[in-house]
């Protein structure tokens, strides 16, 4: 293949003597001759051409490396563009995988968090109500002293139980929300305190609240000289307390039975799946054993 010769281009190159970059024209014959000379010389010594051969490097269209926008890339940019960007000293440290919980453990995490939130709200409301009742009630000289002692004891127990539940919920809940649904969550080892907070807030605290209402009725109606109204209101609160206990038992029983039923259904489904798989394996092994015989 002959070398292309353009007289006008040659004259233009001669006039541009101030160019710092040397321009060359390379043909296929030059490259073949250079390769032949290099093979004859044994591949060692000085460079085979008096001029540098052009080198081209592929660079993928990625901004992760050091590539330029004009499409002309360097070897260094093409290599670094395929790598992950390096983190600087000021970047945040990647903590990696912290151990995500499975579905059953995630359910326990969500349940514990919901229990703590409900306990904190209920305990704060009822404890504040009991303190307001104790302060705002007006006591007379005619109020029986044993009734005042009962009121003070019930109010102290009510506030103490709800404050304990509030303290446990406010101490555990922030750490649960900070760690998230991972194995670092404290609800796994602090399950006893979560259940205790739920028991204080919903069961014992609500029963003491009903007793508190009955004692307040006695104090108010005795102050006006009409204790019969206190007897009537207390008689109305007794069936309410019984219904409260019965409903709590029924709800707990139905919840446990539902959980056990779901567990039994999952076990039966898994057993059927394993039986079907075992039957399929037997059916595939039977013809081979017959052929061997």
Swiss-Prot record:
Membrane topology per record: Multi-pass membrane protein
Keywords (A to Z) from UniProt: Membrane, Transmembrane, Transmembrane helix
Family note: Belongs to the Orai family.
Membrane-spanning parts: 123-141, 147-167, 199-219, 231-251
Pfam family of the protein (one): Orai-1
InterPro entries: CRAC_channel, Orai_sf
Disruption-associated phenotype: Worms exhibit an inhibition of intestinal Ca(2+) release activated Ca(2+) channel activity but has no effect on the initiation of posterior body wall muscle contraction, intestinal Ca(2+) oscillations or intestinal ER Ca(2+) store homeostasis. Attenuation also affects sterility and brood size.
Protein name, per record: Protein orai
Gene Ontology molecular function: any one: store-operated calcium channel activity
Extracellular side of membrane: 142-146, 220-230
Compartmental location: Membrane
Organism of this sequence: Caenorhabditis elegans
Annotated segments matching region Disordered: 62-81
